[in-house]
Amino acid sequence: MWRLRRAAVACEVCQSLVKHSSGIKGSLPLQKLHLVSRSIYHSHYPTLKLQRPQLRTSFQQFSSLTNLPLRKLKFSPIKYGYQPRRNFWPARLATRLLKLRYLILGSAVGGGYTAKKTFDQWKDMIPDLSEYKWIVPDIVWEIDEYIDFEKIRKALPNSEDLVKLAPDFDKIVESLSLLKDFFTSGSPGETAFRATDHGSESDKHFRKVSDKEKIDQLQEELLHTQLKYQRILERLEKENKELRKLVLQKDDKGIHHRKLKKSLIDMYSEVLDVLSDYDASYNTQDHLPRVVVVGDQSAGKTSVLEMIAQARIFPRGSGEMMTRSPVKVTLSEGPHHVALFKDSSREFDLTKEEDLAALRHEIELRMRKNVKEGCTVSPETISLNVKGPGLQRMVLVDLPGVINTVTSGMAPDTKETIFSISKAYMQNPNAIILCIQDGSVDAERSIVTDLVSQMDPHGRRTIFVLTKVDLAEKNVASPSRIQQIIEGKLFPMKALGYFAVVTGKGNSSESIEAIREYEEEFFQNSKLLKTSMLKAHQVTTRNLSLAVSDCFWKMVRESVEQQADSFKATRFNLETEWKNNYPRLRELDRNELFEKAKNEILDEVISLSQATPKHWEEILQQSLWERVSTHVIENIYLPAAQTMNSGTFNTTVDIKLKQWTDKQLPNKAVEVAWETLQGEFSRFMTEPKGKEHDDIFDKLKEAVKEESIKRHKWNDFAEDSLRVIQHNALEDRSISDKQQWDAAIYFMEEALQARLKDTENAIENMVGPDWKKRWLYWKNRTQEQCVHNETKNELEKMLKCNEEHPAYLASDEITTVRKNLESRGVEVDPSLIKDTWHQVYRRHFLKTALNHCNLCRRGFYYYQRHFVDSELECNDVVLFWRIQRMLAITANTLRQQLTNTEVRRLEKNVKEVLEDFAEDGEKKIKLLTGKRVQLAEDLKKVREIQEKLDAFIEALHQEK
């Protein structure tokens, strides 16, 4: 019995431990188990001695009493037990994953159905547009005929590229494997999952951004390329300008010219070029020898010249005038057959047909350029050098052909102009006249022979050339007539020699070699030679060329030293005149004077940028106030001052200032700044610099100033920025200190006193002199002034009775004044009363405003403390402070625009104007004038001619 009782006690203890044990580990997973379905094991057996059970915080193992009778157990209130040793987390994880899958699948199906339903609803809401298909052009429906969809399909990405765009399922599986740690906050699985998701989104974003970056990069590269070529173009234009300046400044000593040994004929040609310019400038003619080719139109002058030069270098026309200006051709011997112009470095290869065509075209262009508008021919000479093997050294001048009748399309004075040009060249006593006569026409039709006989009646420097002898032999019935011409018996003229030549068959495409062969063949078979009518030395252009060259050099040796002596005497006279008139001045020609003036002008422009900011702001503020003072006082201050209270005054002022700022003020400010810049620029350009001032530059400086100002335009954005700045300045009403208050009062007093002075002068002119001036200066009033004076006195009486009178007279007041004046015998018109009242009231108002301004000197304390005192409402002082502050800020802003931008832009304009003037020779001649300039120009030219003549004479003696 005792043992049974002990066992029952032990069992109750065990049950109580099971019920109340708190040693279950919270981290273990739960499992639902029924108490009946499990065996409870106890650690004590009945065979053992009963001991006191040990209390434990957790049960690792349970045991049961086997000898206890079986009885019905009662269910415990706790229906769940814990099994610490068994872990079922894989099964639980699978269960949760299955639940997540069902959730995702269900959401996808439901979302898809909802989206389809929404799409169908939207589709039903769209109206049926099938009836309006006719509006769409047919080209839209037939677009498949114009677009190759197969090519587009091939351009689309293939399946491999699409696979790359598909989601990475391996990453998805890896993310699902980390769902075990997903439900734990801050776990690594969650971090990895979010990082992966963020990475996929960033990849899509990166692809979008990369495409946009490519487009931006391509646009930027295109812009850089445009800027690059724009800079190259600007650099080339600048280099071109500089090169043109260097060409104009031939005497620039800064450039090292390599000294080349020139041939004798080239040196002589340079002398003739310089003399040609000198003769054209001073309307004189030198006496140096040259071969002058004259003849009737289409007589073959150009063909003879081409045969001598051995190249078809001149433009040709059948019966049409092609030689429109003199062409000076300098022939010299050289290894290559080339031609070049005096003012160009391009060489034309005369052995190539394309170069010959280009040369003929260039000569024609130069001729047309020399011919002025309304003229047919020009006296200006084109200088051409031709070098080649076997050429005779000489200088020939091809003149326009002499005509007998002026045809349609020609200028009326063409015939006289051609005669004057020909006479100018032939009257040179040392010129060799190469008279060309067409042998295929009657001798009686010749015009040039009479002209040549007048210029050289004794024939001491004339060579007669009969052209087209082949045609003459066929057409002329009597061959003796040709013999008479060659012997000088037919024409009334004499010559040193007579020659007969053949210059081709009339085909312009014939080469020089073919013409020479034809000429030699003709004279070998000609009856004229066989019958001794012509001598062998009188035929062919080769013999002609040798004879002309010998005659030319003989004339040169005889006359060149005499010409040099005459230029030495001219130089001595000019130098003596310079020493007597300008003993302390250096001899500067027009180009050198222009460079000196250019440097002075640029220095004056730089000094413009060195003016102090204070100077700029003072003149800007003063000029701006002079421009806007009338508007401020007449249209803003006076209308606002007629109001009854300060609120209405401020409202009126704000409205009028806003309207003024939006419309007129910025434009006025820019105009003032531009006029100020012009004034300062003119002052720096025109003010004398003391004794060193040279008045010879005055016209040039004035022209540069006017042209620079005309080209300069103020920045377009200046008005917009000024409008904002001025509006903000006028919005501010807070005067911070007493010094600003006093400055505003002083500014207001000055403005009102100036207006009061103008009003006093207007009243004085209206009413005439007062009694003092009438007694001292013996002045009287006119009848009208007397009426004005009586009216003024009557109005002043009315103002004394009511000093608070408004600005306008009422009709009954006008009637009262008129009746009072009529009672004193003064007839007055109502309009005269109004005019007089305007000036009288204006003076009264300005005096009252000045007195009020004086009272406001002690009103800053009331203004600062916002006291309300009707006697010291100084709103007008605040208005003038706002105006003064706006003027200061505007002047500061305009000064910054001037010094930072506009002065530099003006300097750039001045440089461009000077560069343009430097390239315009006529402009320099017009602006740099005077005896001193002309004398320096003469000295320079004569010295250059004499130096070249001396060098040529020295080379000529060495050749002997």
UniProtKB/Swiss-Prot annotation:
Chain residue ranges for the region called G1 motif: 295-302
Transit peptide: 1-87
Residues annotated as site: Cleavage at site S1: 194-195
Annotated region (Paddle region), positions in chain: 736-856
Binding residues for GTP: 298, 300-303, 317, 468, 470, 503
GO MF annotation: an example: membrane bending activity
Annotated region described as G5 motif, given as residue ranges: 501-504
Chain segments annotated as transmembrane: 97-113
Intramembrane residue stretches from the record: 771-781
Post-translational modification: Cleaved by OMA1 or YME1L downstream of the transmembrane region in response to different signals to generate soluble forms. Cleaved by OMA1 at position S1 following stress conditions, generating the short soluble form (Dynamin-like GTPase OPA1, short form; S-OPA1). AFG3L2 is involved in the regulation of OMA1-dependent processing of OPA1. PARL-dependent proteolytic processing releases an antiapoptotic soluble form not required for mitochondrial fusion.
S-S bonds: 856-874
SUPFAM superfamilies: P-loop containing nucleoside triphosphate hydrolases
Mitochondrial matrix compartment residues: 88-96
Region (G3 motif): 398-401
UniProt protein name: Dynamin-like GTPase OPA1, mitochondrial
Biological source species: Pongo abelii
